A protein has these predicted regions:
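Residues that recognize and position ribonucleotide moieties
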Residues: 194
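Conserved "landmark" site that anchors the functional core of diverse proteins
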Residues: 197
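Cell wall/extracellular polymer interaction/catalysis modules
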Residues: 20-191, 201-224
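Boundary at the C-terminal end of the N-terminal hydrophobic targeting segment
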Residues: 14-19
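Sec-dependent N-terminal signal peptides
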Residues: 4-13, 242-246
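C-terminal GPI-anchoring signal of eukaryotic secretory precursors
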Residues: 227-237
Length: 249
């Protein structure tokens, strides 16, 4: 009985070492693993996995302090979070960067390599194409299925301004393509992208730099992206196994 009690106490102790889920949005941005790599972090936080509404927060580091610059309503995938494959209408969770900047409207004032799309531009959604999940110009490259791709200029409202979230940057076939941060459409959901108000994205475009990171998940899961989460979890498992075998002696 004494061994069982000791085992229980030590189990509770080791579990307590792991960062616990947040109960509010008072998030310590400096604890994110990517906080040392950037001075800009976007959080997209829905209230739960199976919802289409979310809140986008944009944080900027000034004088070594993280300050909330923007908070705005957002929409995510029609089937919520947890994208796994092409066409599942879900928004991916995790930490990402932006790797393409484009829109139907003229450059809003960014120094990023912005492309104002025209009739020739597509987002290649053909899993058999060598340029899968990239922006292509049909005048230059035609070896892809346009039916499986997005003719970008047709998405208005929506793609007045857009940034590609680098989900599936490895271009794994059928894993999914074209996950953007873009403007609101006429729907209260997306096909897997993140959508915010047109004027808000236009403003953010003038601030966002190439090192900006975006983290997408529920608030309860935000500690997963803290710099010490993986290490603490590893230590906890090792300690638990050590204690377990020690008590068996």
């Amino acid at each position: 009985m004494e061994k069982i009690f000791i085992f229980f106490v030590l189990f509770i102790y080791t579990y307590s070492l792991e960062p616990q889920p947040l109960n509010d949005l008072d998030i310590d941005i400096s604890k994110f693993e990517v906080a040392s790599k950037t001075n800009q972090i976007i959080l997209v936080i829905p209230p739960e996995y199976n919802t289409t509404n979310a809140t986008l927060y944009f944080y900027v580091k000034n004088d070594n302090k993280w300050v909330k610059h923007t908070e705005t309503d957002a929409y995510i995938g029609r089937n919520g979070l947890g994208k796994l494959k092409e066409g599942d209408k879900k928004t991916p969770v995790g930490v990402y960067k932006f790797n393409r900047y484009f829109g139907i409207n003229p450059n809003p004032g960014t120094e990023l390599p912005y492309i104002q799309v025209n009739e020739s531009h597509y987002w290649d959604g053909d899993s058999k194409s060598k340029n899968y999940n990239t922006l292509v110009n049909y005048d230059i490259y035609k070896d892809f299925n346009t039916f499986d791709s997005e003719h970008l200029i047709d998405y208005n409202p929506g793609y007045e301004y857009a940034l590609n979230i680098d989900y599936n940057k490895e271009q794994t076939p059928y894993k999914g393509a074209g996950i953007f941060l873009h403007c609101f459409t006429n729907n209260t959901y997306t096909a897997g992208c993140v959508a915010i108000k047109n004027t808000t994205l236009e403003h953010l475009y003038t601030i966002i730099n190439e090192d900006c990171h975006i983290i997408i998940d529920t608030k309860e899961n935000m500690t997963r992206y803290y710099y010490n989460h993986s290490l603490l979890l590893y230590i906890n498992i090792k300690m638990f196994m050590f204690i377990f075998f020690l008590l068996l002696l």
